[in-house]
Amino acid sequence: MLAGQLEARDPKEGTHPEDPCPGAGAVTEKTAVAAEVLTEDCNAGEMPPLQQQVIRLHQELGRQKSLWADVHGKLRSHIDALREQNMELREKLRALQLQRWKARKKSAASPHAGQESHTLALEPAFGKMSPLSADEETIPKYIGRKNQSATLLGQFSSSKGDPLCLSSPMSLKIERISSWKTPPQEKRDKSLSRRRQDRRATPTGRPTPCAERRGGV
């Protein structure tokens, strides 16, 4: 404004004696100013759509960040739950291994523990069984051998045709008792009775006890 007023007051100052058209510099300046104003107006008209696009992108980025944060939190909680479950399973596995180790150690320390427990389980049903003494073990063997020898003597006398010896109830009772014995013991008793029979064989010409009874009858 001040420059225009000065130019209007002093028109001779802006002109040159050699200028063909005085006032050409002022027109050029006005044209430049008008062009700058038009450029600014165009830029001002283009800015709102860009700003809206930037705002939309910023909002979309915020949404994506919130979604990723939510997913990350869920994954973190799931990982923590899996860690706790893994720790619990490891503790259970250690406890089982410790129990197995204790059981193996106990079985190695007491190999007859199973037999003792089985005996203790049978005691309430059958009562406590005391072991036989040495005399009680030898008496049945002696009785069995004696009965076997008597049976063999009765068989030897019956082979000579004595009906009294065949019908003797004592011999039948002895045979029943001897039949209860086991085969290995019976074989041993037979061998012993044969030896005794050979030693106690009646001499020739001497009557047997059964023959004497028959003669007396």
From Swiss-Prot:
Top-rank taxon, per record: Eukaryota
Gene from which the chain derives: TCP10L
Subcellular location field: Nucleus
Region described as Disordered: 1-26, 175-217
GO cellular component: nucleus
InterPro entries: TCP10L/CENPJ
TM region(s), chain numbering: none
Similarity section: Belongs to the TCP10 family.
Location of the region described as Leucine-zipper in the Swiss-Prot/TrEMBL record: 75-96
Coiled coil regions, renumbered to chain: 69-110
Name under which the protein is recorded: T-complex protein 10A homolog 1
Role description: May be involved in transcriptional regulation. Has in vitro transcription inhibition activity.
Key words of the record: Coiled coil, Nucleus, Repressor, Transcription, Transcription regulation
The keyword Coiled coil is assigned to this record: yes
Quaternary structure note: Self-associates (via leucine zipper). Interacts (via leucine zipper) with ZIPK/DAPK3 (via leucine zipper). Interacts with MAD4.
Naturally occurring in which organism (per UniProt): Pan troglodytes (Chimpanzee)
Positions with biased composition (Basic and acidic residues): 7-19, 175-192
